[in-house]
């Protein structure tokens, strides 16, 4: 029975040490520009769609915004010091498009924006920390949204190419790992179907999400083409994209549940990776969506296949059990089309895993191993970086700072997920690195500052001071190789 299978999957793996990972394995922390930078209108930066969206009353749970965020724009040297003190060898951050091109068009290059990221990159390298740079983490220049409709317009592909080119030209001599897009699914679904993320569109939920994803895939391939033709030989870097996936486990042995679970993954990973690897969307998506799913020309297919990726980034937090259902009202058109139910409760009443603060996040450590194995098998054993993994605590104002700093559940989460990552390596998956989300507590999109994902606590009431949590100290010990393993030599 699948029920027994699920319970077997929950077996606690052996304790994991730094020595369970290759010596060349990269450990880092991750952030994104809008969530941490602040300085929203400083240094000649143009407004982004998230600047505009958060300034609309009622869009963010606690009425907050990222105008200041955690003020990384002014405190980046302090934050880089923290990364170094904790022992991480890499830092994944994103560049704000409108800090480089204020209007998004490339008609004006903002030298102050270039200088900021140059200084950040140089500060990292001085500390021996490698920069992993995301070009697009959701903060589209608002002028592109207002002037051409943003990602719904095919012209966005060329504008993204111009922006990527400028970043490669200015930073690529020192940046050796580029990520074109972060979680393009979220831009498509939460931005253009459900409407809870900027630009907040839900007027055409059957059309726009798939148009937006279509253009994102082509934009990725365009950036890869530019990098490979103009920069790769001289700069020697690599380029990929980061996709998000909750693992989908069939809720029973029924064939229809197994097919539904496969379909659920097609609507996550396959949506963006299949066109780049196979030349088209998954058949299950075409079957469910019909003509609402755009078609690639033969020339575009060839272009995508030639400009896919050097590595894949996986953002993974949680998993679900999947049952096939037909004609059941779902939370959005996107889920309605998939004809399935995402389940968190086992037949015996137990949850699939312990829930974190966010209602979508349950700790299901075996799911990351299954996701990694799936990606490796389907896409011919690509190098994979886990570019985000972590969990959040609630901040409703009731807990003391002392309690917030002693984040035992986060430590347990990282221990169990890292154990499954090391097992995936033993399975033969080519995993190159792991980035914890996140370095700092920060602006958690529609949830504002009510959710805390950081290894480092940010005191929003007292000058945004930084205080490492227990999880930060755990990682520091782990990276030194002596977590629960005193005195053992690497």
Swiss-Prot record:
Glycans are attached at residue 420. The record marks 342 as: Important for substrate chain length specificity. Pfam families: Glyco_hydro_1. It is an enzyme of class 3 (hydrolase). A beta-D-glucoside binds at residues 35, 137, 182-183, 317, 388, 437, 444-445, 453. The keyword Hydrolase applies. Induction: Accumulates upon rhizobacteria-mediated (e.g. P.fluorescens WCS417r) induced systemic resistance (ISR) in root trichoblasts and, to a lesser extent, in cortical cells. One of its GO terms (biological process) is positive regulation of defense response. InterPro entries: Glyco_hydro_1 (IPR001360), Glyco_hydro_1_beta-glucosidase (IPR017736), Glyco_hydro_1_N_CS (IPR033132), Glycoside_hydrolase_SF (IPR017853). GO terms for molecular function: beta-glucosidase activity. Disruption phenotype: Reduced secretion of root-derived phenolics upon iron ions (Fe) depletion, thus leading to their accumulation in the root interior. Impaired P.fluorescens WCS417r-mediated broad-spectrum induced systemic resistance (ISR) against several pathogens. Its EC number is 3.2.1.21. The active site is at residues 183, 388. Transmembrane segments: none annotated. Keywords: Glycoprotein, Glycosidase, Hydrolase, Plant defense, Signal. One of its GO terms (cellular component) is cytosol. Optimum temperature is 40 degrees Celsius. PANTHER family: BETA-GLUCOSIDASE 42, GLYCOSYL HYDROLASE. NCBIfam families: BGL (TIGR03356). Belongs to the glycosyl hydrolase 1 family. Glucosidase that hydrolyzes scopolin and various beta-glucosides, cellooligosaccharides (mainly cellotriose) and laminarioligosaccharides. Can use p-nitrophenyl-beta-glucosides (pNP beta-Glc) and p-nitrophenyl-beta-D-fucosides (pNP beta-D-Fuc) as substrates, and, to a lower extent, beta-galactosides, beta-mannosides and beta-xylosides. Involved in the secretion of root-derived phenolics upon iron ions (Fe) depletion. Promotes disease resistance toward B.cinerea, H.arabidopsidis and P.syringae pv. tomato DC3000. Required during rhizobacteria-mediated (e.g. This is Beta-glucosidase 42. It comes from Arabidopsis thaliana. The gene is BGLU42.
């Amino acid at each position: 029975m699948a029920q027994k299978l699920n319970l077997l999957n929950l077996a606690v793996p052996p304790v994991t040490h730094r020595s369970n990972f290759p010596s060349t394995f990269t450990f880092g922390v991750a952030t994104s520009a809008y969530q941490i930078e602040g300085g929203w209108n400083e240094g000649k930066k143009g407004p982004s769609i998230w600047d505009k969206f958060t300034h609309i009353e009622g869009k963010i749970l606690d009425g907050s915004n990222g105008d200041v965020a955690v003020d990384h724009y002014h405190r980046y040297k302090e934050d880089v010091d923290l990364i170094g003190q904790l022992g991480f060898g890499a830092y994944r951050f994103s560049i704000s498009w409108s800090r480089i091109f204020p209007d998004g068009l490339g008609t004006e290059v903002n030298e102050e924006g270039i200088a900021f990221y140059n200084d950040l990159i140089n500060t990292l390298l001085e500390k021996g920390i490698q920069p992993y740079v995301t070009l697009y983490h959701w903060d589209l220049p608002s002028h592109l949204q207002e002037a051409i409709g943003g990602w719904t317009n095919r012209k966005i592909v060329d504008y993204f190419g111009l922006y990527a080119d400028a970043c490669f030209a200015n930073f690529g001599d020192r940046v050796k790992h580029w990520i074109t897009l972060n979680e393009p699914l979220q831009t498509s679904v939460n931005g253009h179907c459900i409407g809870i993320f900027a630009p907040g569109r839900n007027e055409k939920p059957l059309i726009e999400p798939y148009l937006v994803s279509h253009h994102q895939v082509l934009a990725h391939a365009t950036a890869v083409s530019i990098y490979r033709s103009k920069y790769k030989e001289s700069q020697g870097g690599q380029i990929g994209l980061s996709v998000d996936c909750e693992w989908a486990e069939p809720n029973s042995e029924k064939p229809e549940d197994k097919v539904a679970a496969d379909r659920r993954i097609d609507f996550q990973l396959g949506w963006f990776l299949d066109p780049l690897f196979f030349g088209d969307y998954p058949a299950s998506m075409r079957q469910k969506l019909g003509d609402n799913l755009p078609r690639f020309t033969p020339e575009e297919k060839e272009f995508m296949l030639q400009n896919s990726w050097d590595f894949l980034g996986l953002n993974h937090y949680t998993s679900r059990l999947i049952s096939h259902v037909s004609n059941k009202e779902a939370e959005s058109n996107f889920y309605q089309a998939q004809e399935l139910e995402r389940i968190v409760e086992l037949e015996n009443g137990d949850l699939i895993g312990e829930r974190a603060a966010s209602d979508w996040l349950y700790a299901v450590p075996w799911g990351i191993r299954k996701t990694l194995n799936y990606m490796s098998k389907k896409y011919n054993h690509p190098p994979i970086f886990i570019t985000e993994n972590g969990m959040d605590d609630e901040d409703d104002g009731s807990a003391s700072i002392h309690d917030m700093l002693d984040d035992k559940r986060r430590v347990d989460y990282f221990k169990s997920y890292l154990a499954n990552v090391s097992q995936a390596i033993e399975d033969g998956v080519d995993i190159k690195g792991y980035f914890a989300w996140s370095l700092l507590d920060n602006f958690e999109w529609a949830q504002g500052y009510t959710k805390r994902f950081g290894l480092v606590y940010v005191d929003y009431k007292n000058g945004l001071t930084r205080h490492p949590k227990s999880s930060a100290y755990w990682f520091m010990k782990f990276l030194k190789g002596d977590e629960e393993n005193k005195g053992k030599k690497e």
